[in-house]
């Protein structure tokens, strides 16, 4: 098991073999990695992970959303990132939120929001569409609007996830 000290965005990208497009945020798609061991990380960032294994979902409803807060230790077992699109999400450093509306609201989100169950196709599409929008903004040249736009997308995604977890 990869057991790091404090996991940063850059360290996470290096561990998973992804390029760091922005020092304060990264997209997670563990289906595109060459990991050969479990990941155990103490985070210095916020995050939202979405896990969906289409094969297992039919059998046991293994699908979840999880909010991550700085200081949490997160484990991602190897078998969770062996299927296409099974573990995706976004990780973002608190500094990304500076001078955005989300900076003041982030602490209002539940510290332990994790929903397990089957999401509807519509709910899955909302999650993947929001993640795609964040990823597209990361590929745009960084300018003075970048953090605000990304934070807005993250806030929308978090609000939807809270809704889905409370249904």
Please annotate each region the language model reported.
Residues 14-17, 102, 132, 136-139:
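Generic surface-pattern signal
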Residues 109-156, 160, 164:
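Amphipathic alpha-helical segments enriched in hydrophobic/aromatic residues interleaved with Lys/Arg
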Residues 49, 165-167:
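Short, intrinsically disordered, charge-balanced linker/junction segments flanking boundaries
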Residues 21-112, 143, 147:
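N-terminal regulatory/effector-sensing and dimerization cores
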Residues 1-21:
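A short, N-terminal "cap"/entry segment at the start of jelly-roll beta-barrel domains
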Residues 12-15, 99-100, 122:
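Surface-exposed loop/turn and secondary-structure junction residues enriched for glycine/proline
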